[in-house]
Amino acid sequence: MSVAPIDFQQVEKRYDDKLVVDGLSFHVQPGECFGLLGPNGAGKTTALKMLLGITHPDAGSISLCGEPVPSRARHARRRVGVVPQFDNLDPDFTVRENLLVFARYFGLAAHEARALVPPLLEFAKLENKADAKVGELSGGMKRRLTLARALVNNPDVLVLDEPTTGLDPQARHLMWERLRSLLVRGKTILLTTHFMEEAERLCHRLCVIEEGRKIAEGAPRTLIESEIGCDVIEIYGPDPAQLREELAPFAERTEISGETLFCYVDDPEPVNARLKGRAGLRYLHRPANLEDVFLRLTGREMQD
């Protein structure tokens, strides 16, 4: 695709007197995985609904696969696969039947739909579950089936809303591996997620939104370096305020969340030296990550 598969320009959406999407702008490049991150109620799902033409924006412009939305949303969606936040598989059908029926929605002939099923089952690692009812599948299997179903029309763009919510770590990693294989095949992916590790592993770029506004955008590593830029020492124990006073001179920045003190350090040794052998304290020295960025930007439970 020569044009940006997804483009938002100064998009606004209001419900009654509440502005839930406020001048949101971003674009997604062909073959890119782009993440929308934000706390609950930030406007992520509303943005996806507007992208798909389900909800109409009050201002701004949206294009999907080169088509203006909402006026040409139905046409654009023929080149898009969608994985909703909650599975909407038909429980009365088998795994195979779910794929066959969905393929017919895109106008595929019966023989074309049947030819699609084996490679999709292989992709989802469900070859041995073709004749199983949906109710017999694990949560991870259902999510992979939903992803396979989103591929029946060979879409250019995939839109995924919280694709691994509710999955155990093993199922989540398998889903990530499947998504990475789609990127290798040149698919463009837009996803929302609450899992910072997921965003860091999958996304080439991401946009952090809060209260409908974009507050940061960039590659995960770039955001980590610009917003945090150092190592982190997490210290768990009583009286974090007293510890903060003691350790602040040896840190670039400190934050307290509950009973945890976060020390952001360029040189961890002075802080580590003062923590060794302390009774009643536990601490963890680690590289800065995307969760640190998210908490710093959104301010959730953190106080400077």
Swiss-Prot record:
Please report the name of this protein according to its UniProt entry: Nod factor export ATP-binding protein I
Q: Which Pfam families match?
A: ABC_tran
Q: Indicate where this protein resides in the cell.
A: Cell inner membrane
Report how it sits in the membrane. Peripheral membrane protein
Q: Which InterPro entries does the record associate with it?
A: AAA+_ATPase, ABC_transporter-like_ATP-bd, ABC_transporter-like_CS, ABC_transporter_ATP-binding, ABC_transptNodI, P-loop_NTPase
Q: What is its main location?
A: membrane
Residue positions binding ATP: G38, P39, N40, G41, A42, G43, K44, T45
Q: Does the keyword Hydrolase apply?
A: no
Q: Name one GO molecular function term.
A: transmembrane transporter activity
Keyword field? ATP-binding, Cell inner membrane, Cell membrane, Membrane, Nodulation, Nucleotide-binding, Translocase, Transport
Q: What taxonomic classification does the UniProt entry list for its organism?
A: Bacteria, Pseudomonadati, Pseudomonadota, Betaproteobacteria, Burkholderiales
Q: Name the family.
A: Belongs to the ABC transporter superfamily. Lipooligosaccharide exporter (TC 3.A.1.102) family.
Q: Which Gene3D superfamilies match?
A: P-loop containing nucleotide triphosphate hydrolases (3.40.50.300)
SUPFAM superfamilies reported in the protein's UniProt record? P-loop containing nucleoside triphosphate hydrolases
What's its job? Part of the ABC transporter complex NodIJ involved in the export of the nodulation factors (Nod factors), the bacterial signal molecules that induce symbiosis and subsequent nodulation induction. Nod factors are LCO (lipo-chitin oligosaccharide), a modified beta-1,4-linked N-acetylglucosamine oligosaccharide. This subunit is responsible for energy coupling to the transport system.
Summary of subunit composition and partner proteins: The complex is composed of two ATP-binding proteins (NodI) and two transmembrane proteins (NodJ).
Look up the EC number in the record and give it.
7.6.2.-
Ranges for domain ABC transporter come to 6-236
Cite a GO CC annotation.
plasma membrane
PROSITE patterns (UniProt xref): ABC_TRANSPORTER_1, ABC_TRANSPORTER_2, NODI
